[in-house]
Amino acid sequence: MFMGEYHHNLDNKGRLIIPAKLRDQIENKMVFTRGMEGCIFGYSMEEWQKIEAKLAKLPLTKRNTRKFMRLFYSGAMESEFDKQGRVNFTSTLKAHAGLIKECVIIGVSDRIEIWAKERWDSFEEEANEDYDDIAENLDDIEL
């Protein structure tokens, strides 16, 4: 399970270090794709296969399914970590997430998310204001 918040910068070649605490939970490879709210989602190969199986069951007759799958898969990249644990994202993913220099990497249970620091700060500020209300509306789980 992925968790935690880590701050790293893109290096001068556009590579980002994925923290060892996150890398240690997977093999040497992940799949990265467009995430929600302007971030990048990163999945272990095992988790990616589960997602692919779920997406394969969606009806292609639905326009929104086709749109989502096109964007989700066209932005996806399989990547191995280099010896320093770095990943070099495609220009498409960097543009989607607004990655320029400062990045925040967070663990979110079955995936990691990579955010531009400014976007993460904005999201976190807004979400923190609603945290109690959001939790209250999650009736299905009892924390």
Swiss-Prot record:
Report the locations given in the UniProt record: Cytoplasm, Nucleoid
- Mind listing the GO biological process terms from this record? negative regulation of DNA-templated transcription initiation
What is the protein name given in its UniProt record?
Transcriptional regulator MraZ
What gene makes this protein?
Answer: mraZ
Keywords assigned by UniProt, alphabetized: Cytoplasm, DNA-binding, Repeat, Transcription, Transcription regulation
Taxonomy, top ranks, is: Bacteria, Bacillati, Bacillota, Bacilli, Lactobacillales
> Which PANTHER family would you find in this protein's record?
TRANSCRIPTIONAL REGULATOR MRAZ
Please name the CDD domains in this protein's record: MraZ_C (cd16321), MraZ_N (cd16320)
Per the record, the domain of life is Bacteria
- What GO MF terms are annotated? DNA-binding transcription factor activity; transcription cis-regulatory region binding
Q: Which organism is it from?
A: Lactobacillus helveticus (strain DPC 4571)
GO cellular component terms listed in the entry, alphabetical order: cytoplasm; nucleoid
Pfam families hit by this protein: MraZ (PF02381)
* Family indicated by similarity: Belongs to the MraZ family.
